[in-house]
UniProtKB/Swiss-Prot annotation:
<feature type="compositionally biased region" description="Polar residues">
    <location>
        <begin position="755"/>
        <end position="764"/>
    </location>
</feature>
<feature type="modified residue" description="Phosphoserine">
    <location>
        <position position="1253"/>
    </location>
</feature>
<feature type="compositionally biased region" description="Basic and acidic residues">
    <location>
        <begin position="542"/>
        <end position="555"/>
    </location>
</feature>
<dbReference type="GO" id="GO:0005634">
    <property type="term" value="C:nucleus"/>
</dbReference>
<feature type="modified residue" description="Phosphoserine">
    <location>
        <position position="1234"/>
    </location>
</feature>
<comment type="similarity">
    <text>Belongs to the SYCP2 family.</text>
</comment>
<keyword id="KW-0539">Nucleus</keyword>
<feature type="modified residue" description="Phosphothreonine">
    <location>
        <position position="619"/>
    </location>
</feature>
<feature type="modified residue" description="Phosphoserine">
    <location>
        <position position="529"/>
    </location>
</feature>
<feature type="modified residue" description="Phosphoserine">
    <location>
        <position position="519"/>
    </location>
</feature>
<feature type="modified residue" description="Phosphoserine">
    <location>
        <position position="465"/>
    </location>
</feature>
<feature type="modified residue" description="Phosphoserine">
    <location>
        <position position="664"/>
    </location>
</feature>
<feature type="modified residue" description="Phosphoserine">
    <location>
        <position position="1161"/>
    </location>
</feature>
<feature type="modified residue" description="Phosphoserine">
    <location>
        <position position="1297"/>
    </location>
</feature>
<keyword id="KW-0597">Phosphoprotein</keyword>
<dbReference type="GO" id="GO:0007140">
    <property type="term" value="P:male meiotic nuclear division"/>
</dbReference>
<dbReference type="GO" id="GO:0000795">
    <property type="term" value="C:synaptonemal complex"/>
</dbReference>
Length: 1530
């Protein structure tokens, strides 16, 4: 062999690395090519030097140096010569394989420390080590046996270790299979031991969770190579627990391994279902750039399988090689090699395009782009994203650059309910701009889309994305876009809502909920949408497509809903049609206030849920609000609720984008609001008109008149069906964009405020329920929408718009607001409107239960058909449709909203409205108190019937949130205390209305739509630490309105109220002080008066401060007590006494109604509402009536000073004092009185100055008393009582200006008390207040008329002057005594109640503490028990594992012992025992040799002796001859 000097330096390089730690020479040596005939001489110490160097570097974990050493030894191994012998053989004898085992173990430790992370250096090191093993394996049979015996078990253990990276496992399993392929037959016995059987079983389990198809194949191949076919039949059931898998494994044949293994692994992976980590899909064709890759030529290979490996994050498949035998060639595409990929549908095929970072060579073909075609039905998107990541998805990147289609699309509905897109440009030029804005907002909406939408439409998503990218303006009607049945809406996963197929099957359709956004939202929406687009980022492209679809859909849906609603008016959803039409109609609608009113509760909920993501915006058009704005707003609110629900989900998915969008929306809102103002004015007028219309429809009378009303509405409905249809079609898109934008703005505003609203979460839940119902309703709407579409005509729309404008102009003036409001109230009262239903509506809206039937709700609200529908107003438990009151109030609110919008109603009214808005919109911004506050949802008459959500959702979402918030209560408290509204605003905004003024404005807009309430909204709900249910609070407000109108006004109370109303905010406190002074003058005992005032304050404050009376539970208990006590008191008291409370309440109500809700003091407003609600509520309240009746009869006392009307009223009601069932009389009283509210108000105002101070005192006391009584009654009677409760609030506030100060004190005290205590205290206060007021009334009334004196005491001579003195003195003393007694009674009662409360509180606390302690102990012991149980389980497991290890070790020991004995026996037999045969042969052979040797020696001896004798003879002869010659010579 030739010797190359450069390669002779191998050992020297090893020495340098070992001694000098210099690996450069060694790495340089590796670059030299080595020929087979080159011989490298090394010393005997070379092996030890290599071992020491590798061990050192492994300990240092210097992977690169270890690889260099292993590569050098592996490459030069066959050329190394040690002392003239083969180097590897010599090193094997020196223990190379045993040393390599140690190297492998140390390398294994390094691998395990790396975890599953992929490290190229470690992977290369393991490959180099295994390559060296292969070199040694091929040297000799001895080397093969040692390598297999030592390394196969270790490699198997490394393969089944889940902590090792899959790539490493793939490499070593391949090398192990290469070893096993060359393994000699006798070496199989080595693999039949128990240890290998256990490892094989573990390898079988590893197949299930390998996560890579190549690894699975390698494991199956190893199992097949380590066992014979017969052994596999026996061991398969041990390896696989499931029989069908074991049988499939048995069917694998060595001759058909590739195909059989494919069948087996496809079965295994398919069986795993969602848990599988290898997804295999059949590929139709594969291309590398332009070159097609061929499927392996195998008859059994049915499909061109592509494997998506989640574990290794690779895509792999096999192709036919270019060699002659067409062997299989594996192609693997790892994630790190992919630059970008895309998935799209082309010609009913799904194309996966993978662009690689570098050019690759596959089967002699080079390329950089891999194209894989799949069947369109296969879902490969999610799997591909899991492997390559979503960031490399071209769709998300490409869509960012996609231009947004500016063409407005108009939606029509065909007979099947399919939505058809028509270029909006063909319908109205304005639509394009709106659509562009809308599309901008769509991107965020798209992100907001729930994932459920996204998944189902993945297939159509690509097509739709392409279509929508271009959004052809010439889109044909046959090209239906985004159609999904309502039932499928919420089950869909994918965001793609549209499918390009013409009228796709309904099961594939998705109809997004209607988007109820007012036109006022336009600008802000566009801005918001733009911001959202920015936030979209990489997802933008997808979202943009979805946005386009969704926006169009939203528009279409809005239109469709509106149209369908109109048609359904007489069918399923009598009331809803109109409202939705109104929502869809013109931008001129009262969008601003309604905007937020529509979504007040919904928006609050949305905000509370932080659903202000794009979804809220994409609700279909709310434009059709003209006719039934309230209803429309309700429907819109409901729709928004649906959207909100969806948004909620979306928001969760894409909270970041939604949040940023929300911020952008906030900014856009400001700009947008400016633009909205123009539309708002017009819209408000329209809203009012619609409200009136709706009110008529919704009146209790309307329930009976629904058919008649339908005829009336037919003006709207007919026009709406036709013109509205056309409007919807033409304007729907524009308005949907605008309204959506508005909605987004309002939503953002509400979100800011609603997040603070505690009831928001509840509303969200209700939204979800509503969604389910809505889906079913949508289906019915689809068919109806087609009819509407056919009827749509632009000309009819114009007519309708003109009529709307004319009606708007009539009611658009601010001065008309109050009157219209009063008229609405009166009409409501006359119609016998059921307060309870209205309250329920608002409540449900607040709770978002309306969501369950948002669309249906819309229909019901607008439609007038008396269908016995779940959503029918009449079904609320009252004959009167719930919507009536809300609608009327809504109309009034709209009017007020108009006035407020420009002027913000005069101080007192504004203040009232502000307060009401605080109640109504606890979560909304107070900036626009007047607008927002004109009407509160609480005014909708809940009758404590929270469960009745069917109607509440029908109504416009009331501007007021569901529950009174603590923050709201604080605000209310401020109002009561007589502080300026500014202070209230500060308080409320800080707590709930922290959002910007823009938000407040938006909220204001929404309020009108929701249902604008009259001064009722201004009513200050009494603060209660425990918020009433939505139904309760709303009932109170609404009932208070009607009551105010119906109750006669007492002059003195009116006077105080008028002052309160007229006085500026700052003057309220002064006014309160003045009233107190007057009282003190009238009551000559100032100290008693103060005490009484304090008491009253304490009594009244809790309720007045709490937006609602004390909690239901507490109040009911109170009611029982108070009713008994009060009833007794009334019985004992003369009729003259009872009239006072009623008169006062009536006066307060009249003053409120007369002022038109301008009451300035929020406190007074709430009280007045409560009082008014009791007497006025059209709904009978048996428990409550006895008190009402006395109140009515009280008007008799003031006959002289009160108008004849009042006399008539009192006379009418005088007999109902003790009649618990005086519902009819009370109702008549309200009916008679309501029309004359203004008249009463004027009379009371005139007579105000004439009222005696004593009368005023008594009236005030009565008001207080009445206030307390109604509150109790309200709770007692239930929902109805709740309604009246609000009115009670109103009356008290109006009647008692003095109580302003008193309530301030009371409020302070109430705030300090816990919820429960406060409620109890409230009840107590009411009770003793009633008794006190009753007694005061009795003293005031106790007087003998002059006529009676003359007739009955004719015998006593007395002048009239003397009579007056005696009478006055008697009254004075009576009053003083009464005050003293009442004070004593009050204090005693308070003391007793305080002690009782303390005792109860302490006992409860102690019990609760004990229970908590016991619970804590139980929980702790349970935890300890669980820990102990777990420890026992662990111990048992460890014991089992330990026993198995012991068994294994014992088995190994037994086997080694047997081998040892055998070896000893054999050695003994060979070494110890003698073998004569062998010795004999040796002896024989040796003897023969000896004989031969002896013979040779003998012969040699004889020869020597003969030669010696002959020599002697010769010598003697010579001597003889010589002697003879001498002699001769001689």
């Amino acid at each position: 062999m030739p010797i190359r000097p450069d390669l002779q330096q191998l050992e020297k390089c090893i020495d340098d690395a070992l001694r000098k730690n210099d690996f450069k020479p060694l790495k340089t040596l590796l670059q030299i090519d080595i020929c087979e005939d080159v011989k490298i001489k090394c010393s005997k110490q070379f092996f030890h030097k290599v071992d020491n160097l590798i061990c050192r570097e492994l300990n240092k974990e210097d992977i690169h140096n270890v690889s260099a050493i292993l590569v050098s030894v592996g490459r030069c191994g066959k050329n190394i010569s040690v002392l003239g012998q083969a180097g590897l053989l010599t090193m094997i004898k020196q223990g190379l394989i045993q040393k390599m085992v140690a190297w492998f173990e140390k390398s294994k430790d390094i691998i395990q420390s790396q975890g599953n992370s992929k490290d190229e250096a470690v992977l290369n090191m393991i490959e180099d080590l295994v390559d060296l093993l292969l070199v040694i394996h091929d040297v000799s049979d001895e080397g093969k046996k040692q390598v297999v015996e030592s390394f196969v078990p270790r490699i198997c253990s490394l393969v089944i270790d889940s902590r090792v990276n899959i790539c490493i496992q793939q490499e070593i399993i391949k090398k192990m299979n290469a070893m096993l392929d060359k393994m000699p037959q006798d070496a199989r016995k080595i693999l039949s031991n128990q240890e290998m059987l256990i490892l094989m079983s573990s390898m079988g389990e590893r197949i299930l969770d390998a996560g890579d198809y190549d690894l699975q194949v390698g494991i199956v191949e190893a199992l097949c190579r380590m066992t014979t076919e017969k052994q596999r039949q026996e061991l398969a059931h041990q390896w696989f627990s499931m029989d069908f898998i074991a049988k499939a494994f048995k069917r694998i044949k060595d001759s058909e391994f590739e195909t059989d293994c494919r069948i087996f692994l496809n079965l295994v992976n398919g069986m795993l279902g969602d848990k599988r980590r290898v997804f295999t899909f059949p590929c139709l064709s594969a291309f590398l750039d332009k070159y097609e890759l061929q499927i392996p030529s195998d008859e059994k290979l049915e499909e061109f399988w592509i494997d998506f490996n989640l574990g290794s994050q690779t895509l792999s498949f096999y192709i036919a090689g270019d060699n002659d035998d067409h062997q299989w060639e594996a192609v693997t595409v790892p994630e790190e090699k992919v630059q970008i990929y895309s998935i799209e549908v082309r010609e009913s095929k799904k194309l996966l395009t993978i662009i690689l970072k570098n050019t690759v060579k596959i089967s002699k073909r080079e390329g950089k782009e891999l194209l894989l075609y799949f069947d369109a039905s296969l879902e490969i998107t999610n799997v591909t994203q899991k492997i390559f990541g979503a960031t490399k998805h071209r769709e998300s990147i490409r869509k960012q650059g996609i231009s947004v289609a500016k063409t407005s699309l108009h939606i029509l509905f065909d007979a099947s309910g399919s939505q058809i897109l028509v270029p909006e440009s063909q319908i109205s030029p304005v639509g394009e701009e709106l659509v562009s804005l809308k599309e901008k907002s769509k991107s965020p909406k798209e992100f907001a889309k729930p994932s459920k939408y996204i998944k189902n439409s993945d297939k159509g998503n690509r097509n739709n994305s392409q279509l929508e990218k271009t959004t052809p303006s010439k889109r044909k009607m046959s090209e239906a876009s985004m159609i999904v049945s309502g039932a499928d809406r919420y089950t869909m996963r994918s965001p793609v809502l549209f499918s390009n197929t013409s009228i796709p099957p309904r099961r594939r359709r998705i109809k997004p909920p209607l988007q109820m956004t007012s036109s006022a939202e336009k600008p802000s929406v566009s801005q918001t949408s733009e911001n959202r687009v920015d936030n979209a980022a990489s997802l933008k492209s997808r979202s943009s497509e979805g946005r386009h679809r969704r926006d169009n859909i939203d528009k279409h849906i809005k239109t469709a809903k509106c149209v369908e609603n109109t048609e359904n008016k007489n069918v399923e959803f009598p009331n809803q049609n109109f409202s939705e039409l109104q929502d869809v109609i013109p931008d001129s609608q009262a969008a601003e206030k309604r905007d937020h009113t529509i979504l007040p509760g919904v928006l609050d909920n949305i905000c509370g849920n932080k659903i202000h993501s794009k979804w809220a915006c994409w609700t279909p058009v709310t434009n059709i609000e003209l006719c039934n704005n309230q209803r429309a707003s309700t429907s819109s609110g409901d729709t928004l609720n649906q959207d909100i629900v969806i948004n909620k989900k979306l928001t969760k998915q894409k909270s970041s984008s939604s949040i940023s969008d929300h911020n952008s929306e906030g900014t856009g809102k400001v700009k947008y609001k400016k633009e909205q103002t123009d539309h708002i004015k017009i819209d408000k007028a329209e809203v009012e008109v619609c409200k009136k219309h709706n009110q008529q429809q919704n009146h209790p009378k309307y329930s009976g008149q629904k058919n008649t009303e339908n005829a009336k509405q037919s003006d709207w409905p007919v026009e709406s069906e036709t013109t509205f249809k056309s409007v919807l079609l033409n304007k729907t898109i524009e308005e949907s964009l605008i309204y959506r934008k508005k909605y987004i703005l309002s939503k953002d505003v509400n979100t800011a405020t609603c997040d603070k609203n505690p009831s928001a979460s509840k509303n969200v839940q209700s939204h979800r329920k509503a969604e389910k119902e809505l889906t079913s309703e949508l289906n019915s709407w689809d068919s109806k929408q087609k009819k509407m579409r056919e009827k749509s005509k632009g000309k009819e729309f114009t007519n309708v718009a003109e009529s709307l404008i004319s009606q708007i102009n009539k009611r658009y003036k601010t001065k008309d607001d109050i009157k219209s409001t009063r008229k609405l109230k009166e009409s409501l009262i006359n119609s016998g409107f059921s307060n309870k239903p209205v309250v329920q509506l608002s409540k449900e809206k607040v709770q978002k239960k309306s969501y369950r039937k948002l669309k249906t709700t819309f229909v019901n609200v607008t439609s007038e058909c008396p269908v016995n529908d779940v959503y029918n107003f009449n079904l609320n438990g009252a004959d009167d449709p719930i919507i009536k009151l809300g609608i009327q109030e809504f109309q009034a609110t709209a009017k007020e909203a108009c006035a407020d919008r420009s002027i913000r109603l005069v101080g007192p009214r504004n203040h009232d409205e502000l307060k009401s808005s605080v109640k109504t919109k606890d979560k909304k911004i107070i900036t626009n108190h007047q607008k927002k506050n004109l009407f509160s949802d609480t005014e909708t008459e809940y009758r404590c019937d929270d469960s009745k959500t069917d109607i509440s959702w029908l109504r416009e979402p009331k501007s007021k949130p569901q529950l009174i918030d603590y923050s709201r209560n604080k605000n209310v408290k401020n109002h009561k205390s007589g502080k300026s509204r500014s202070s209230l605003e500060k308080g409320q905004p800080s707590s709930k209305m922290t959002p910007s003024k823009n938000i407040t404005k938006k909220m204001d807009k929404t309020i009108p739509e929701g249902r604008i309430r009259l001064p009722r909204k201004a009513t200050k709900t009494k603060k209660n630490y425990k918020d009433l249910s939505n139904s309760e609070s709303e009932c109170e407000q609404e009932f208070s309105h009607s009551f105010k109108e119906n109750i006669p006004v007492k002059e003195e109370n009116i006077h105080s109220r008028m002052k309160t109303v007229k006085l500026p905010k700052k003057q309220q406190k002064v006014f309160c002080a003045e009233t107190e002074k007057e009282l003190s003058k009238q009551w000559k005992n100032s100290s008693l008066l103060k005490d009484a005032i304090r008491d009253n304050c304490l009594d009244l404050s809790p309720r007045s401060l709490s937006g609602s009376p004390s909690s239901i539970e507490v109040t009911r208990c109170i009611e029982k007590i108070t009713e008994k006590d009060f009833t007794q008191d009334y019985d004992c008291i003369t009729k003259s006494i009872s009239p006072y409370p009623k008169t006062s309440s009536l006066e307060s109500l009249n003053s409120n109604s007369g002022v038109g809700g301008t009451i300035k003091s929020p406190k007074n407003n709430e009280k007045n509402f409560l009082c008014a609600s009791e007497s006025c509520s059209p709904i009978p309240r048996p428990l409550f009536l006895p008190r009402h009746t006395p109140t009515k009869s009280n008007t008799i006392v003031n006959r002289k000073k009160i108008s004849s009307l009042v006399l008539t009223q009192e006379t009418q009601n005088s007999n109902s004092y003790s009649d618990v069932s005086s519902y009819s009389s009370e109702e008549r009283f309200m009916e008679i009185e309501s029309p004359h509210i203004n008249e009463n108000y004027i009379q009371s105002k005139r007579e105000e100055s004439h009222l005696a101070s004593s009368l005023s005192k008594s009236s005030e006391g009565r008001e207080k008393t009445w206030f307390d009584m109604p509150c109790d009654a309200t709770h007692v009677s239930g929902p109805t009582q709740h309604l009246s409760r609000k009115r009670i609030y109103i009356e008290d506030n109006l009647s008692n200006s003095n109580e302003v100060e008193m309530e301030e004190k009371g409020e302070r005290r109430a705030n300090l008390l816990p919820k429960k205590l406060c409620k109890i205290e409230d009840a107590d206060h009411h009770i003793h207040k009633m008794s006190e007021s009753v007694s005061s009334l009795s003293t005031n009334d106790f007087s003998i008329p002059w006529e009676t004196w003359q007739n009955e005491f004719a015998g006593i001579e007395m002048t009239y002057e003397t009579y007056e003195r005696l009478n006055s003195e008697f009254k004075r003393r009576n009053n003083i005594r009464h005050k003293m007694l009442s004070y004593f009674t009050t204090q005693s009662w308070k003391t007793a109640q305080q002690h009782l409360r303390t005792m109860n509180h302490q006992s409860q606390d102690s019990r609760i503490k004990k229970l908590d302690k016991f619970q804590f102990i139980i929980i702790e012991e349970l935890e300890n028990f669980e820990k102990d149980s777990q420890s026992l389980k662990d111990l048992e497991k460890e014991f089992v594992d330990f026993w198995e290890k012991i068994f294994q070790k014992f088995s190994a020991y037994q086997k080694s012992e047997q081998q040892r004995l055998h070896l000893l026996k054999t050695s003994l037999a060979k070494s110890v025992f003698c073998n004569t045969d062998s010795e004999e042969t040796v002896f024989t052979s040796e003897m023969c040799l000896m004989k031969e040797d002896m013979k040779v020696l003998q012969d040699r001896l004889l020869k020597d002796m003969l030669e010696e004798e002959l020599l002697n003879v010769r010598r003697e002869l010579m001597s003889v001859f010589m002697s003879h010659e001498r002699n001769a010579n001689v």
